[in-house]
């Protein structure tokens, strides 16, 4: 019913990015590495254990404060999602100020104040430093953690989770993390609706009372402030902060693979596959391989001139972009390479990824590639020095990772000294091409068998858990029987065939914008009309009659192509299952699948011109629970109610990667077998 409206909604939400053409035929030759004057951090430590780093820079009358808590990674378990609430809860009000007062006072002086579960940051003009520090200290010492704020945050988190469960990129990240680290590791666990629901205000308070301690904290001050002034300021605002015991945590290192494996999440409606190839690596900031890994990544998948980009996009045309990363971490790092590719080239793209990984390890890099990468990274490093946050991170990293005091001042010299042999050694140290985690999120029916050439294919759900084993389809079950069971479940053939047409109104809301959708089905004459109103104004209409279709958006009318009309016919009838045979559709039963916990028969419905959708019918009830459409996304049917002796789904929920939140449309008016005139379809 809603396919054309959804396409209209998507057109309102999707923006098109333009990319400038860059001449890469000439690349500047790398010169000698410049001497970087960052400014040496002066340090002192308060009696409570707070370590302070001061990087004075009086060129601008600004000062920034960055407070970082050095706790071990935290496995949240059945409270997963807790840490995401801590910072916002702390800013939601103190014993002295409401949330609005905090925001207003920060805005009034043109300052910034941020809080997370592991950090606080504040910045302002020099003349306002007392005010911003007073606000920072108030939030640090006196949060009240209002219950109503947590409930609001939990609702927002649940909405975001619902969206991410149908976003291929989010699914891919969850799956890759789960496979690389395991679900019992802090880097592999996932936030669920249940874990969000488990979080209480007492949990947030407990976290705050446990981890917000000065003896595990570093404070970096960057800007117009001397060490002597910093000592006075820090003692004033942080000197009375009480230290405390903070728990330590250790985790097992992920077990190495014996051989490459493939993880697959089946999204039948996907026309693309999100591919990620990953591996845990032993890499920490300051390691011998750290700087060379930055250069290695720039060559392999760090930008538009990298090997992955050149191969998969410019040469093969499989994707808009292919990238890689080497993430450093005290606990365990990760190598990753990823791209989104067309379904039909999924296996070819994976082959090229593996080819490039093998080529990198076995053949190494060239001097020309090394020179270009150094030049690119030197420019990026130089630009980063303009950010106070970057300067603060340099000072903190020197302490946290026990780096030489001049580590960042000599960063470019160290990078410039790297040779081809150094980069090749790093590739060999960090990557094992025979033990990769390959993950794919896409149309399983199209890609599963093709991926088996790379390793055992393991099936997962959209939260990164092993997919439930569905029972086998009975030998005598067919797609026709599934449809017969559906018709019987909604009320029987006689009552269903008695419906010759319908008028209905549906109400929906997208990001605060209310939509009204009016639909008219004339099954007897194969006519259909749809109108979408936003704020009472007609924004989109579509009409199908006499075998032709017309769509109009904001008054601009355009005829539908034969292919568009062919696809739209699937939604022309009020009860399309009654007409599959007469319309010449081909039905294929594709097993039993899990639809959000409900075992359901999957039926592929293909039109004579080749377009198709997937319908899912509950094994238990026979009712249709889901439709997958390559254009509009996934539609879930619920709240079945009897109308004229036939069960009708009164709620349809659309989930699409192109809609920021699920679109829930409810039938508010329904008229069965109304009198219809030609005017209804003009």
Residue ranges and their predicted role:
Residues 22-29, 218-283, 442, 448-472:
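An aromatic/glycine/proline-enriched structural segment found at the starts
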Residues 21-26, 164-213, 234, 323, ...:
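Scaffold signal of the M16-like zinc-metallopeptidase fold and its non-catalytic homologs
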Residues 481-556, 585-589, 594:
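N-terminal mature ectodomain segment of secretory-pathway/periplasmic proteins
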Residues 93-96, 124-154, 284, 327-384, ...:
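M16/insulysin-pitrilysin zinc metalloprotease superfamily fold
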Residues 195, 474-481, 488, 546-612, ...:
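Flexible, processing/modification-adjacent segments and terminal tails
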Residues 276-278, 301-341:
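A structural supersecondary motif
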Residues 535, 598-681:
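Gly/Pro-enriched, hydrophobic low-complexity segments
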